[in-house]
C-alpha cells in the first residue's frame, strides 16, 4: 500500500492497533478526507478475525468493502460474500478477473445482492480498479475486461 500511495502521490499512514486506527479515522473525518484502510486477508472461519472485521465495519464513517478473487469457486465465493456481508461489508471488489477463463465467481459476486464496487483486470496495482457498470461487467464476462475499445464501432 505504501508503494501504491507513493505511485499515485497520496499520503500514507500506518495505524497501530484499534486505538491508533480510531485516532486516524477521527483525524480524517475532521479534515474531511478519505482514508483507505487496508487489512490482511483472513479466514472467515476464524471467530477472532470475523469479530475484528465486524468491529472495523462499525467504526463511524467507515465503509467496509469485501474483496474476493475471480479465480475462486463460484459456490465458495457466494458463501464468502454472504459471510462478508453479514459482518458489515457494504460493497465488493472482485480481483483477478483477467486471470481466469471461468467467471463463475464474478457472476456469483455480481448476483449475491451485495453491490460490486470495482473489479481488477490487471496484475499491476498501478492499473487501478475498474468501476463496475453494466457495460464493464458485460465486457468482463465476454473476455475483454479492461479493453476500452471492446465493443466500440470501428
Locate predicted features:
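Short amphipathic alpha-helical segments
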Residues: 48-50, 78-79, 104-107
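Structured C-terminal portions of repeat-based eukaryotic scaffold domains
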Residues: 57-60, 79-84
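Conserved Switch II/interswitch segment of TRAFAC-class P-loop GTPases
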Residues: 42-47, 60-77, 99-100
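NTP-binding/hydrolysis catalytic cores, primarily Walker-type P-loop NTPases
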Residues: 110-154
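Short, well-ordered alpha-helical microsegments
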Residues: 21-22, 77, 102-103
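Switch II (G3) loop of P-loop NTPases
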Residues: 5-52, 57, 69-70
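Conserved beta-strand/loop subsegment of P-loop NTPase cores
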Residues: 61-68, 85-126
Amino acid at each position: 500500500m505504501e508503494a501504491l500511495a507513493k505511485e499515485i502521490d497520496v499520503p500514507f499512514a500506518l495505524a497501530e492497533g484499534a486505538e491508533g486506527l480510531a485516532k486516524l479515522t477521527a483525524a480524517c473525518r475532521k479534515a474531511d478526507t478519505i482514508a483507505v484502510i487496508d487489512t490482511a486477508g483472513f479466514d472467515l472461519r476464524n471467530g477472532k478475525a470475523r469479530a475484528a472485521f465486524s468491529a472495523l465495519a462499525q467504526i463511524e464513517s467507515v465503509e467496509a468493502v469485501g474483496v474476493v478473487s475471480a479465480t475462486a469457486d463460484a459456490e465458495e465465493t457466494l458463501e464468502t460474500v454472504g459471510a462478508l456481508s453479514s459482518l458489515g461489508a457494504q460493497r465488493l471488489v472482485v480481483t483477478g478477473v483477467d486471470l481466469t477463463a471461468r467467471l463463475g465467481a464474478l457472476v456469483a459476486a455480481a448476483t449475491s445482492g451485495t453491490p460490486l464496487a470495482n473489479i481488477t483486470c490487471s496484475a499491476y496495482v498501478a492499473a487501478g480498479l475498474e468501476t463496475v457498470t453494466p457495460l464493464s461487467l458485460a465486457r468482463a464476462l465476454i473476455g475483454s475486461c479492461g479493453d476500452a475499445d471492446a465493443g466500440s464501432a470501428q
